[in-house]
Amino acid sequence: MASQSQGIQQLLQAEKRAAEKVADARKRKARRLKQAKEEAQMEVDQYRREREQEFQSKQQAAMGSQGNLSAEVEQATRRQVQGMQSSQQRNRERVLAQLLGMVCDVRPQVHPNYRIAA
């Protein structure tokens, strides 16, 4: 009987050691998975940063030329508006005088297509 209880004790101890080894293996596996996940996330972040930087440089190159065109168009528009304003200032009095002259100096006359009914 003592040998049986000793055998049972050995089996229980062996089972306990096996359970500990399995638990340790699970912990190691969980750590490896966590580490692999962190490494993968770091790679993804690095790739994302590289692609974002590449996109920004291409966008800057494309928008840089458009920015110059936009500035040129805006400057040309300003020059035209200034030219129109100065022309308006120069011709304002003359146009007003012409307009008032046409309105106030009425010369009544018969229309050339008018036929007197006889």
UniProtKB/Swiss-Prot annotation:
Cellular component terms (Gene Ontology): clathrin-coated vesicle membrane; melanosome; synaptic vesicle membrane; vacuolar proton-transporting V-type ATPase, V1 domain
Tissue specificity comment: Expressed in brain (at protein level).
Start-end of Basic and acidic residues biased regions: 35-55
Record localization: Melanosome; Cytoplasmic vesicle, Clathrin-coated vesicle membrane
Membrane topology recorded in Swiss-Prot or TrEMBL: Peripheral membrane protein
Family statement drawn from the similarity comment of this UniProt entry: Belongs to the V-ATPase G subunit family.
Protein name stated in the entry: V-type proton ATPase subunit G 2
Species assigned in the record: Bos taurus (Bovine)
